[in-house]
Amino acid sequence: MSAKTYPVLKAAKAQALIDNDKYLKWYEESIEEPEKFWSKHGKRIDWFKPYTKAKNTSFKGKVPIKWFEDGLTNVSYNCIDRHLKTHGERTAIIWEGDNPYIDKRITYNQLYDNVCRLANVLKAHGVKKGDRVTIYMPMVPEATYAMLACSRIGAVHSVVFGGFSPEALAGRIVDCESTFVITCDEGVRGGKPVALKENTDVAIDIAAKQYVIVNKVLVVRRTGGKVGWAPGRDLWYHQEIAKVKPDCPPVKMKAEDPLFILYTSGSTGKPKGVLHTTGGYLVYAAMTHEYVFDYKDGEIFWCSADVGWVTGHSYIVYGPLANCATTVMFEGVPNFPDQGRFWEIIDKHKVNIFYTAPTAIRSLMGAGDDFVKRSSRSSLRLLGSVGEPINPEAWEWYYNVVGDQRCPIVDTWWQTETGGILISPLPGATDLKPGSATRPFFGVKPELVDNEGKVLEGAADGNLCLIDSWPGQARTIYGDHNRFVQTYFSTYKGKYFTGDGCRRDEDGYYWITGRVDDVLNVSGHRLGTAEVESALVSHHLVSEAAVVGYPHGIKGQGIYCYVTLMAGHEGNEELRQTLIKHVRSEIGPIASPDKVQFAPGLPKTRSGKIMRRILRKIAEDDFGALGDTSTLADPGVVDDLIANRQNKASA
């Protein structure tokens, strides 16, 4: 735990929307009188029919969560139409291509035209309110148009990260029974093409075998690369939008109508379709965007995430556009053409607020300061971090080298399920401690409990729960509300269990210590160990697999796989590489194993349960305190695992 404290910067305090007194006053009201607080702040978006009650929620029983429930609104209207009178010619999106010489600016007027046309294309091909549309796209403006077009007509979008494999895409199409897919001929990342249309074709064939038939595929031409074509099913985006009108009225949506499904990893193998609804989500995304980033009208905001993750949904698309900000959308990667790319983009587009992940910060820190120093970064006023806890060394580098000691850092903690930021400093209100997410946002009530569920007071180390709802909270898991209740509300009755461990210090600051369930956080992306295990076991030579995380210098957590082969087979380097490739093709490159250890057996209890605690310790090269191994069916396997570990300190 870092002992250093950085007081609120004078310059940040002077112009901040919220100082410490205001934070304390608002926070108290948000906790003591949530109905009054949220009734007031719900008005930050436009409503066709105003709500009469803000909050109607319970974390007990079937966990019904409803916010602003009798109000009518439309997300697309709030992100576009309401800005047109005053700011139609303001840049809504700055698109920076993978190639540093290609960029594009889209005004709010142009955004309106593009979104309305795409909405009309969807309607022309039979997409109705409530239908699920899968978006499998690279970081191009059309991905944003697709999300907003769905929200305009009441269709529910399911964005799938363009780095996922055809198998992963198919699983997500099948789960939400999506019949319309929007994709690209190819994506471009780091100068290399990504075969999105080809992957989509494979995924559609897999889905069809599970009786989910995709009727239409709308294809954006990005590279002009050669693609397969199914006449009658496949449609060119540029041809379709030319046939329709540039106006489409927004559908009046109930606040609790579904807005999107986003799949996230759970501790069991099947990804969960987290469902967010319309009113509460937008209020919360817009409000956190304004106050956490201390956003001022006309500023340029860059979140370097991908729209395939929740961070992209809330802080590239919905939060910034609801606030009439200029949002930067970057197609490429931080190290192409070289490791100075982020800082060059900041100078080129005069970015004021920059929000990225600790993994990127650590890898760019490793490349040395020269790449940073050749840019001025003089437009920067605020830095943010998201996706995983940031280690103090990376925080200090980000603050001192990137921000020149003049930009506050907001280290934000939240999840796919929370819709927006829950714990974070506010730049004009919060003294900073490197590595701490600091204090809860308005309306957020954290609680630490021990493994038995006993509430821990004061400075303590425990499991992080939330004891009351906030507007951005997910409402269910698509098609499986029982799983929603079981996953989040059954471990500690009446509380939302985050799955994260957390320490609270004597100042009441929160320090996230990492996952306490079977979920990995690799480069800020969640991956279920069970997902990786089932990918490994699907290989014909693998009899059993166990996957754990271990500390990784760049990614935060690396993926360590223990593999038992079928009888008569020996592990070797060639097979190790084959298995790594196999996992990549089953899930995608983000799931690429870092270490594969062949093991004759895994440590199991007599009831057959794998003792992951032991595997974690061995993966961490820390087996001095393995605890009680007497319950193991075959204690001898532990010695073999230790002898053949892949992570020896000397290695």
Curated annotation (Swiss-Prot):
Report TM segments.
none
The UniProt annotation places ATP binding at 387-389, 411-416, 500, 515, 526
Q: Which residues bind Mg(2+)?
A: 537, 539, 542
Q: Which residues bind CoA?
A: 189-192, 311, 335, 523, 584
Cofactors: Mg(2+)
Q: Enzyme group, top EC level?
A: ligase
| Residue numbers of N6-acetyllysine PTMs | 609
* GO-annotated cellular components: cytosol
Per the UniProt entry, the Enzyme Commission number(s) are: 6.2.1.1
**Biological processes per GO annotation:** acetyl-CoA biosynthetic process from acetate
Against PROSITE patterns, the record matches this protein to: AMP_BINDING (PS00455)
Q: Which reaction does it catalyse?
A: acetate + ATP + CoA = acetyl-CoA + AMP + diphosphate
**InterPro entries, from UniProt?**
Ac_CoA_lig, ACAS_N, AMP-bd_C, AMP-bd_C_sf, AMP-binding_CS, AMP-dep_synth/lig_dom, ANL_N_sf
Recorded hits in PANTHER family, A to Z, give:
ACETYL-COENZYME A SYNTHETASE, ACETYL-COENZYME A SYNTHETASE 1
Name this protein carries in UniProt: Acetyl-coenzyme A synthetase
| Annotated gene | acsA
